[in-house]
């Protein structure tokens, strides 16, 4: 019982400390926390393929690259990570592309709770807009457009990838590719560091990818 009270007290202190921070500092701390959490998850046995040794430095680099959507890799995504590991990278790319504040507010909206003024200020800071009025509606629109484009992109990509992979594998590749393309992440999970070179003559996939990259960059 005492241990539980100590944990609750520690969590209360952390939340009280965060409340005193500026929106920009909270966003920076949020990115740092997501990157560190991502690195730890990528080092877990369920994330790394058998026989692959992933150092903390390489896991941290991969997580940072995914969250900051730079596209730089030090290990091949498909050859090094399991389906769960690739799912972690996909989530990191999505969070990095949308932004910590937008994801946080989106979760609050999904939970049916009221979005606080501080949360609105964080979104204002992250999206670089002049007013925090209409922030909830803006986040809803951003999330809807993002998920809409990614869903359509994944569906079209599946039409291409299902010819070369099993249905389940093709679904995984399609979702990963669509999210990575829309967020301009530069990651691929086709293996062998080939990226989309094997599909350089596939007009449908190339046009779809181009549209995702352009739409995500707007």
What is the predicted role of each segment?
Residues 1-218:
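Membrane-proximal intracellular helices of multi-pass ion channels
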């Amino acid at each position: 019982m005492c241990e539980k009270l100590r944990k609750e007290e520690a969590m209360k202190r952390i939340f009280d400390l965060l409340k005193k921070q500026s929106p920009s500092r909270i966003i920076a701390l949020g990115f740092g926390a997501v990157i560190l959490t991502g690195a730890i998850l990528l080092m877990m046995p369920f994330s790394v393929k058998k026989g692959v040794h992933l150092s903390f430095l390489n896991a941290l680099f991969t997580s940072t690259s995914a969250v900051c959507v730079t596209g730089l890799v030090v290990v091949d995504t498909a050859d090094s990570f399991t389906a769960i590991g690739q799912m972690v990278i996909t989530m990191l790319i999505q969070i990095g592309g949308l932004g910590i504040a937008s994801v946080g507010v989106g979760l609050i909206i999904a939970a049916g709770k009221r979005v606080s003024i501080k949360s609105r200020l964080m979104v204002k800071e992250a999206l670089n807009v002049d007013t925090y009025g209409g922030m909830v509606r803006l986040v809803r629109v951003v999330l809807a457009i993002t998920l809409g484009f990614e869903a359509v992109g994944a569906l079209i990509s599946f039409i291409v990838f299902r010819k070369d992979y099993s249905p389940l594998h093709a679904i995984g590749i399609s979702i990963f590719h669509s999210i990575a393309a829309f967020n301009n992440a530069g990651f691929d999970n086709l293996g062998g560091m080939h990226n989309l070179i094997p599909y350089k003559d596939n007009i449908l996939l190339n046009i779809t990818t181009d549209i995702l990259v352009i739409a995500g960059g707007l």
